[in-house]
Curated annotation (Swiss-Prot):
Natural source organism: Halococcus morrhuae
Keyword annotations of the record: Cytoplasm, DNA-binding, DNA-directed RNA polymerase, Nucleotidyltransferase, Transcription, Transferase
GO biological process, one term: DNA-templated transcription
Single GO cellular component term: cytoplasm
Family affiliation: Belongs to the RNA polymerase beta' chain family.
Gene (name only): rpo1N
Stated name of the protein: DNA-directed RNA polymerase subunit Rpo1N
The reaction(s) this protein catalyses: RNA(n) + a ribonucleoside 5'-triphosphate = RNA(n+1) + diphosphate
Length: 349
């Protein structure tokens, strides 16, 4: 029993799905609860079989029912668009109230912040809530069988934020965590007056990707997108270099039979592996789902010695030498009744 990414309870009893939906949290590459439990209780071999079976089942389901996504899957009703427009108007009014309070020197600064920083922070919070509100409105008008919603909620691809930006509102564009302030002297673009502090003058994109961005919104969006591209390139190079240094530094370390970690010169790096002599792979990540070692041992022993008809689910021990000898014995022709082989003598024509 565990909780899925959508907050629903997933319960599996004796291999049968009793409650909930299987999503990325159940069989995902990182932190899949079902796969993790199978590895700990039944071994890696059974987990590999399970992953292959799930992949085959998913492919058969997609081939049978079909799954596709198009531009119409991000469309919302006129009533939803009217609600979103009303939410945006309320956000603009709230931002203008903050600006008026700031210009009248009535805005109180937050602890540890200047008045200017307080204004920017409150405007960002207001516009963020407006985008979230637009996303909630759009989400209410999407059907449960919408392909985009299925992908987002199952964790297959994308998120509800991506769906919000496609259908409702892209939201505030940020550079270095702040509203866009760079551009011309005293203003971001020549389309705005100097000193304009409004939402649209500092990178707020009201439109959605489906409805299309205005030229000014597109320019601000490109500024935010450029930061993402540069950050991705820099982060990749830094993390790659860090990984290379770690590999070079740790490549000579190995765990000895006495539990210590040593290098090739037999210098002790750790008296116990990980300071607790415990493999993280075999440790439960949840206090609610502790590993019952006694139950696993009883089940394995029962399967091995009591019921010979039950297939052992764990990893079978193999002896490569014996396996090769058996294969050679099977392939070697029998000597009983075999026809004699003529071997020519040296010198015969």
């Amino acid at each position: 029993e565990f909780t899925s990414s959508t907050g629903d309870t997933v319960m599996i009893d004796e291999g049968a799905l009793v409650e909930g939906t299987i999503d990325e949290d159940a069989v995902g590459a990182f932190g899949g609860e079902i796969v993790d439990t199978i590895v700990k209780q039944y071994g890696e071999t059974r987990a590999r079989v399970f992953i292959n079976e799930v992949a085959s089942l998913a492919m058969r389901a997609i081939m049978h029912f079909g799954f596709s996504i198009g531009i119409d899957d991000e469309s919302i009703s006129d009533a939803a668009e009217a609600q979103i427009d009303e939410s945006m108007d309320n956000a603009y009014e709230r931002v203008q109230e903050l600006i008026d309070t700031y210009e009248n020197d009535d805005l109180e600064s937050l602890p540890g912040r200047t008045v200017d920083e307080t204004l920017e922070m409150k405007i960002m919070q207001t516009l963020g809530k407006a985008r979230d509100s637009a996303g909630d409105i759009a989400d209410e008008h999407f059907d449960d069988d919408n392909p985009a919603v299925i992908m987002a909620e199952s964790g297959a691809r994308g998120s509800m934020l991506n769906l919000t930006q496609m259908a409702a509102c892209v939201g505030q564009q940020a550079v270095r965590g702040e509203r866009i302030n760079r551009g011309y002297e005293g203003r971001t673009l020549s389309h705005f007056k100097p000193g304009d502090l409004s939402a649209e003058a500092h990178g707020f994109v009201e439109d959605s990707y489906r409805s299309g961005l205005t030229p000014r919104e597109f320019f601000f969006h490109a500024m935010g997108g450029r930061e993402g591209l540069v950050d991705t390139a820099v982060r990749t190079s830094k993390s790659g270099y860090l990984q290379r240094r770690l590999i070079n530094a740790l490549s000579e370390l190995e765990t000895q039979y006495d539990g210590t970690v040593r290098d090739t010169s037999d210098n002790i790096v750790q008296f116990e592996f990980g300071e607790d002599n415990t493999s993280p792979v075999k440790v439960s990540s949840s206090d609610d789902n502790e590993i019952d070692v006694d139950e696993i041992a009883d089940r394995v022993l029962a399967a091995e010695f009591e019921d010979e008809g039950e297939e052992f689910a764990g990893e079978q021990a193999t002896n490569l030498s014996e396996s090769a000898d058996d294969r050679m014995d099977r392939d070697r022709p029998s000597s009983h009744g075999a026809a004699p082989i003529d071997v020519p003598e040296v010198g015969d024509d």
